[in-house]
């Protein structure tokens, strides 16, 4: 199965979901689209009938001043449809804002025009947290198969099937941290911490971009996230000289991550 996890030229469909939040957004989209098609068909039919009757007889509606029944119908019918759309929207909005007990936290900082990531739960051998900056790869440095304006020199690495909290802020202007396949879009506002959670259910590479106009190089702020197995994530921690004997790392990897396999 080929997954659609990146934007495609002339693409009109949503990217494949990799989290429960993204799946809920897709279901809500289909739910609302049903009512939109229903309204489009009904309104188009009414307009067709009115135009056809008027063309055949311009005095067809000469003495029509009001219609109590139709007025009640076009008041109640839209109200019912709005309620049918609103309730699922409110439920999904609440679920997307809910942050469950996270196994790990990643701090995301937006700057003009790059991202900075901090793994505050993990410390290296000298007692410092893992942190790095992520820049877009210029066109003249792209390798074969790389994605223009989407690939970065470094990427976020997270384990699969793990509750992850992203704490998002900015240092200069407003940015927006967005990864469509994860159903994630949250503003990065200077002086404010916003948070969102994600439970990525399959491994892969996911791309996003800054979705808030933030200056001349707004289009040069891609996001690249790699979701790997728990074993590969622990190996990545070792490559960054994280001490696996520290209590915080044991809690976030051994206890919270390995138990997911069972």
Curated annotation (Swiss-Prot):
GO terms for cellular component: mitochondrial inner membrane; respiratory chain complex IV. It catalyses: 4 Fe(II)-[cytochrome c] + O2 + 8 H(+)(in) = 4 Fe(III)-[cytochrome c] + 2 H2O + 4 H(+)(out). InterPro entries: CcO_II, CcO_II-like_C, CcO_II_C, Copper_CuA, Cupredoxin, Cyt_c_oxidase_su2, Cyt_c_oxidase_su2_TM_dom, Cyt_c_oxidase_su2_TM_sf. Cu cation A1 binds at residues 175, 210, 214, 221. It is a multi-pass membrane protein. Component of the cytochrome c oxidase, the last enzyme in the mitochondrial electron transport chain which drives oxidative phosphorylation. The respiratory chain contains 3 multisubunit complexes succinate dehydrogenase (complex II, CII), ubiquinol-cytochrome c oxidoreductase (cytochrome b-c1 complex, complex III, CIII) and cytochrome c oxidase (complex IV, CIV), that cooperate to transfer electrons derived from NADH and succinate to molecular oxygen, creating an electrochemical gradient over the inner membrane that drives transmembrane transport and the ATP synthase. It comes from Candida albicans (strain SC5314 / ATCC MYA-2876). Its main location: mitochondrion. It is an enzyme of class 7 (translocase). This is Cytochrome c oxidase subunit 2. Component of the cytochrome c oxidase (complex IV, CIV), a multisubunit enzyme composed of a catalytic core of 3 subunits and several supernumerary subunits. The complex exists as a monomer or a dimer and forms supercomplexes (SCs) in the inner mitochondrial membrane with ubiquinol-cytochrome c oxidoreductase (cytochrome b-c1 complex, complex III, CIII). Belongs to the cytochrome c oxidase subunit 2 family. PROSITE patterns: COX2 (PS00078), COX2_CUA (PS50857), COX2_TM (PS50999).
